[in-house]
Amino acid sequence: MTNTGILAPSSQQSEPEWWTKTQKFFSRENTITPTFGYFRLLFGTQPGKTDIALIVIGTIAGIGAGIPFPLLGILFGELVDDLNSSTCSTTQAPPGGYQAAITTKVLQVIYASILNFVCMYIHTGCWSMVGERLVRRLRTKYFHSLLRQEIAFTDTLPSGDVTSRLVSDIEVIQAGTSEKVGLFIGTISYFVAAYIVAFLKVATIAAMLMSVVPIYFLMAFGGGHYIKKYSSRISTHINAATSIVSSSLSHMSIVHAFNANARLEALFAQHLVSARMDALKKAITHSIQFGMLYFVAYASNALAFWQGSRMIADLAEGKPSKVSVGAVYTVIFVLLDASFVLSQMAPFMHIFASAASAGDRLMTTIKRQSAIDGTSSEGDSTISLASEEIELQDVTFNYPARPEVPVLQGVSFKIPPNKHTAIVGTSGSGKSTVVALLERLYDPITGCVRVGNRDLKEINVRHLRGSIGLVQQEPNLLDRSILENIAHGLVSSSQEKHKHLLPILLGPSLSELTEKIRQGASEDEAVAEQGDVVREIVNLARHAATLSNAIDFINALPDGLATRVGSSGAELSGGQKQRIALARALIRDPPVLLLDEATAALDSTSERLIQAALTKVSENVTTVSIAHRLATAKDADNIIVMQKGKVMEQGTHMDLVARDGVYAGMVRLQNIGKFSSSSSIMTESTQVDVNIDRSLTTDTLLNKEEKLSLEQGVLDEKEKPAQLYMPEEADSLPTEPEAKKEKPKQTLWATMRGSFPLIRPNLLLISLGLITSIMIGVSYTGEAVIFGHTVGSLSVCRGGPSIRSSGMLFGLLFFILAVAKFAAVIVNGAAFGWAAEKTLYRTRVLSLRSLLRQPLEWHNADGRTPGLLVALVTSDASALSSLTGTTIGVLFSTVANLFAGVILSHVIAWKIAVVLLATLPVLLASGVLRLRVMAQYQKKHQKAYAKATAITVETVDNIKSIAAFSLEQEAYSVFNRSLKAPYKSNMKSVLHGNFWLSLAYSISTLVYALAYWWGSQQILAGMYTQVQFFIVLPALLFSTQSCGQMFALVPDISKARIAASNIVDLLSIKHEGDEEYDKTGSKASAKHTDPRFNMLEDKPRDVEAQLTTTTPSSFPTKGMGVQFRNVHFRYPSRPNQPALDDLSINISPGQFCALVGPSGSGKSTTFALLEKFYNPASGSIIIDGVDITKQSGAAFRDTIALVPQENVMFEGTVAFNIGLGARPDVEATQEEIEEACRLANIHDTIAALPDGYNTVCSQDGKQFSGGQRQRLSIARALVRKPRLLLLDESTSALDVESEKHVQDALAKVARKTTIVAIAHRLNTIHRADRIFMIEGGKCVDQGTHAELVERCESYRANVIHQSLDA
């Protein structure tokens, strides 16, 4: 596909037509064979000339590396002829002229060894670079493709899919396109060269054996087809499981609050069980494929021995024959060795098939055509949106994730230029969808959106979005500095005055600037070093921050504009994030401004100031705002009222109120009232009130409160998600579960000991696998014995009948060996495959269990991000499981082969064996050095690309913001910069490691030379016979060749070693309640039983099926009493800044209380301490008379429910998500779930879905609107039947009608529940039993709504501001 957009290469070099056709051929999707799939992987990603040169050179060198060994067969054949021509006696020494021939042949072997080393180093180096360059190209193309895709595509993308593609699939592809390719080519070259030599020597035998070659390829490709099929199925299940892990680790506060870890773990286990069955089928298929290769190889040798013996017998009987004993020996020797080498292809075929399958999965996304490409240069880029009318004409729309659910139904209205149009309506009525269509994040199903007289589809997407300033309902910030986030608004600005800023915005200058400031440089000095353009950007950012009322809190931060906001803005409060997002929109000075609940997270005073600023800057701007607070919409020039995807009415505030229609009803529901001169409330809402407000002060107190909020740096827990991503520190601890300063590095012995409990349940399978591995290893020694006796029996001096009978006997023995090895390999593969999958299941479940049980403080530690912790459960667990799979099988068979060969050689001819054995330490040393180099490489590689993966995941998570501000090019630049340093470092490590790999392989040829020379010397001296020599020689040479294969597995062993250390570290962490029954469902059966490894079910229960256990009547019927006594607390990440300072409050059982105060005053921190996410530094928190700070465990949470401000959905059905709220020992029934949904006013919405309560929620519930997600969260809390209900802005995203329904439901619950609420909307708390005013971490006032209005000016000012009648 030709890319003409902003992310296309700056220059395109013309390519030859033949190369273009080659690329197109291998890129064809209808090519189904694994071979073409693999070539499609190599050539379908537009490799450059350097890549082609590396492939060509690596292929030639690989071919060259395979040629020397078959030539040795000719030398050995000549030796046999020399021996046979000298004497027919096996004890008589050859003549003295034999010494000169030995010296010549030894030198030839040494030359072959040097040639082999050079060729091997070249081909391993070339292919390693090919693999490194290929995965880098795939990373960039995959990331680029994700940036190009329309939002509808990412909406339907499984949440764990991106991580899986960039971690698991990339690792598989790199393993299948690196040095192993060169080794594979060398093997094929070896095989072909061996047959060429065989045909030159004895064409008849060679032709017979050639007939079995198609069987090799049939098994290789047929097995590859099924392996690919099962790999695809496994990937589907693993992606779903990864999604659960990712969403769980991203929302640990919810997991802890509801003790949901057991249910999430069970759902995770279900997906693993499904994947395990396909993985077992894949392992059996692979073992059959591998076993057939061995069977064919050994059976062909049996045929060769039998036919060769007949030819030699004819020669011995004087019949005409051009065949010599040496020629037959050469054919048997080279084809025997070729068969051995070919049998080593099976593991490579498995790796290549997996790589091709992974490549196809990536290429599916890479080649996908985007319906709305924000990077394309197509469309009109000259049209101006200033002073143009915007019109929706009969628009219908439904989201791709829910195509059966209509969102907009024939919507038509006009947005006049340079006017303020407000859109109000019920939750889920389509308001935010209208904004998405105006931004062209989606296209209408029917109808059109027009700007002036142009259809929106005719305008260049980037130009359109660059003319619009968007503030979303849930503001998303990228993990950069505040300065960079605000400056993102300039990247695609349509204003000509901003064009010259683009090179700086896309480069590293701003990142370098903020890094210098964080390291201690003053802002003025750092800006001066960067130049005038950077200074201009900083000034623009400051001006925008001033307009959005953010400048005061920014200046109060230690690093100011250079402060990193964390992942998704986690280091900032909700109100602060919203103000930064508003500054990002205003900095581009757009002709169109879209505000989707732009001030929903702000206190009343801040909202009023921002509204005034917006009024000023939007004098000549077309403004479209969405609001649930009608007070922010009443001054609009036109108000559009929507319900159920239709426009119900429109007009000015006064007109709509006068009509007494839908809008007037909303006004009556939301109006708090107006005040008389005596400050008494004239009217009150009839609603039942459940939430709170962050009441800020009047203008005179605003700066004071900003100081309280920001100079102290206090973050409410709701404003600070559990996971903080800190890229500058991430590399220091990518996956280790304990900080380095706390946890020393695991020794090898400690790692092995810690891993044993994971493997112990599978010891029977592993033992069976080890026994068959030993049988496979020893079979090579048996082959050497048969081979040696065969060579001795083919002497013409023995007579024809004897030769024929010996040939028949040893041919039969070889066939028996073929059958035995075939059976052993199948049993071996099945046993190790099943053991590996069971170990993988156990490791992943236990790893997730341990992660979900860690406290929030642990998750908040530096370097622990959800993306990096996911790797512990996915790639690390997979790497560890390989130690109970094929890797350990090959390792043990190699060791068995080595020991059996050494022992047999010493028994048969110890003088020859002892000299050859002396070379073994050299061989092993080269392998150990390779292991050390590769271990260091794997660790560096794992760290290096973690940041690039995190950037990609963050981009997908924030794709709507990326698209809305056309940040594709900026994100692409940051991503590419993150790849440069790791790429250079990895290339050096690869080239260094391949030196030792080549040496480990090539040194075996020198062993050939030494064996040839020393063995001949012993034969000359009459110490040993030819039979003894030809038993010892292949026995030891097969052993050394096996060692070479073992060293090829070094990278896998290295990965497993690192992974095992990481997982053992994780599982070694002790948790509160390990000695007791814990909420994950594991219970120690004895005092000495480690509860971490208990009760792992192979068939987990179906957590989607809701079962009745405990009846509601068994629950307590009164609320909890809560007391805070002189509580002091500081967040671990900010130990010098108090969050709570001597807080004391008292909440009686059954009361409805509210916490009110400025942003960052400590309100949500009280919720975090009530849930025991953290422990206070001092003071007491008493629930029902028990001080929870002095109690172990968190059983008290069983009767507490939390509704967070940021509503979280997990991968699973709607019923599952709501059922997560049930108490740990209870499964909510379907009736209870539906009742909770009715109370939350969401039942009808769910019932209208095609799958109803079985509708699958994607991570974060992207297919639901913000209000719908909030109602689902409320239902989840209500199904718990809590005694204490914590509501953190629980109705902020609801329309007034839904809010009334919810509050009516909460009024029923309040009779036997204590409710504590935080809210901005004062109309939701004015009937609270007690309202606590929190400022600076203290309770500065308390009372009823009326009492606070009378004596607290700031509270009264907020009431006035929120009143529509004011």
UniProtKB/Swiss-Prot annotation:
Cellular component GO terms held in the UniProt record: mitochondrial inner membrane; plasma membrane
Glycosylation sites noted in the Swiss-Prot or TrEMBL record: 84, 620, 976
Gene Ontology molecular function terms on file: ABC-type oligopeptide transporter activity; ATP binding; ATP hydrolysis activity
Pfam families registered for this protein in UniProt: ABC_membrane, ABC_tran
Residues annotated as transmembrane: 52-72, 106-126, 180-200, 202-222, 288-308, 323-343, 768-788, 807-827, 868-888, 898-918, 995-1015, 1019-1039
SMART domains recorded: AAA
Region of interest called Disordered, as start-end residue ranges on this chain: 727-746
Keyword Nucleus: no
Entry protein name: ABC multidrug transporter MDR2
